[in-house]
Amino acid sequence: MMNPPYSMGSRNNAALYELSFTGHLLDSITRDGKVIVIVPQSSVTGKTKEEQAIKDNILKYHTLEGVISLNKNTFYGVGTTPCIAVFTTGIPHHKEKLVTFINFEDDGFEVQKNRGLVETSAARDKKQHLLDIWFSRTEGGSKFCVKTTVEPEDEWLHAFYYFSDSIPEKSVFQKTMADYLTFEFSMFVQGRGDLFENKKDNDNSITAGLINDTEWERLADKKWREFPLTSVFETIQRGKRLKRNDHTEGCVPYISSTSLNNGVDCFIGNTEGVRVFRNCLTLANSGSVGSTFFQPCTFIASDHVTKLENKNFDRYIYLFLAAVISGISEKYGFNREINDLRIKKEKILLPVNKKDEPDYIFMGAFMKQLEHELLHRYDIHNSGANSSGASH
């Protein structure tokens, strides 16, 4: 077992990467030996070509058994989020081998004021559960353990391979629709109703009808299947960096990584060196990572958001997808953003039709019915308030 020296590696000196030290250790152990290393999670993500080459070389001669993601406070006060990687030496990694990836961030230790890192009463049971999963004595949900094949360019971490197979609750979609309607109303109140003058262009005949009450409430009754984001959206493109000091006065929404106000950070007038989009989703790739919003009007995208576009979708389908995609936020955070590689690997769970294809008709009609319900509820409330006022 080893904790390699702190990385001083670079493109010009790849030998000083933690992973390079790990490779040297593996090469030094006799065949079929077990090697355990504790390294920063960043060392197994393989951000550079040099690091990916090291990972590729390790797999040529040794077997990766598994990686355990640890509590970010394991080395309290250091500011490094570690993981444990386990290898078998001298045996080339078979491409079909299932590698065990475990999320052990919740290990039963917590930081307490004036005491530092403290072991709680739950720590022992959590450790036993970890061992039972590792040695296949029991089954664990995918949120805790994922077993999968690996590639050198992959990030050897649970978060990279984890995919939630939980069907979103109806309340998730209700909130997405309510938040969007609130944003739209807010813009009208602020005198920015012209932003939505092309609103009808965002509607599609695919959602021309409403499905009945008994069907649209039963999300769980639909068959769901996973799909890569790259198969759902025709275009996935990051916005462009624009320093705040370079903003000019204007009336075009500037979408950044905020989780509030439909992602609108401010309004600007820049026309050069910017990326302008319309009628698509924006996904926060940093900051409030995972926050996803439908953008019906022309906007300027910062580099902190990624555009997700399919020209065949209307606003109702987009809103359904926004609710689903927002769920991936649990995998990300301040220390783990959505880069181009991660988004290409990302998958979402969608309802399917009889052909096992995404049921966009259901998605659109479902959200249209939700909109109808929310607006009807508002009309009843508004009518009641007016009647009450008139009686006085």
Predicted segments with their positions:
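A short beta-sheet element
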Residues: D265-F320
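Glycine-anchored helix-breaking recognition loops at helix->coil/strand junctions
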Residues: E169-S171, N198, N202, H304, ...
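A conserved beta-strand element that flanks and buttresses the S-adenosyl-L-methionine
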Residues: M1
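A conserved structural/catalytic subdomain of Rossmann-like adenosyl-cofactor enzymes
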Residues: P4-S205
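Short, conserved charged micro-motifs
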Residues: H93-K95, F313-L319, K354-D359
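General detector of folded, globular domains
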Residues: E226-L229, Y254-I255, T282-L283, F293-F294, ...
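Non-catalytic DNA-recognition/assembly elements of restriction-modification systems
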Residues: F144-G239, N245-N261, K354-H392
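Conserved hydrophobic/aromatic beta-strand scaffold that supports enzyme active sites
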Residues: I84-V86, Y254, T282, K307, ...
